[in-house]
A protein has these predicted regions:
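Alpha-helical tetratricopeptide repeat
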Residues: 2-168
Length: 168
């Protein structure tokens, strides 16, 4: 999950960034609170940023990540869906939704979202690895092992372990 959060923060596009300095200040405060583990405080500040700028896709996505960490899966899914509706070219949003779907055992949804993420970012090793795990759950070993290999090619250490475990 930490890698997913870092991925979302590092690979975020500028399209979803707010042009409003007050919204951005709340967003910045929320990031700091999330980094120190104050997830409820971060959610409050992301919400304030969103109220000022309802099209602030990055705030929705980060709020989704914080909600997911506190177990508000429904709220996280709503926020990530909003992110995608605002900015459908955000691969990291599809990867985040795929992670939520995976943890909810919606493997078909995970595969679809990972595939979309890979279309938008062909080197998204998190999406390849997560899609590979989903293929394992639906007993499609061939595609799982191919995805683990791709994830390894792009730098995933988790995929190395998964390939050793599932692709014998």
């Amino acid at each position: 999950m930490k890698k997913l959060i870092l991925f979302a923060l590092l690979l975020s596009s500028f399209l979803g960034w707010s042009q409003d300095p007050i919204a951005y200040n709340y967003f910045d405060q929320a990031l700091k609170k999330a980094a120190t583990g104050n997830l409820k405080g971060s959610i409050d500040d992301y919400t304030k940023a969103i109220k000022i700028d309802p099209l602030f896709a990055e705030a929705y996505l980060n709020r989704a990540l914080s909600k997911q960490k506190i177990g508000d899966i429904k709220g996280a899914l709503t926020d990530v869906n909003t992110t995608i509706s605002i900015d459908p070219k955000r691969g990291d949003a599809y990867t985040t939704r795929a992670d939520i779907n995976y943890k909810s055992k919606n493997y078909k949804g995970t595969i679809e979202d990972c595939t979309q993420s890979i279309v938008l970012n062909p080197k998204d090793y998190i999406a390849y690895n997560l899609r590979g795990l989903s293929y394992i759950h639906i007993e499609d070993k061939k595609n799982a092992c191919a995805d683990f290999s791709k994830a390894i090619q792009y730098g995933s250490q988790s995929a190395v372990k998964n390939k050793k475990m599932f692709c014998k």
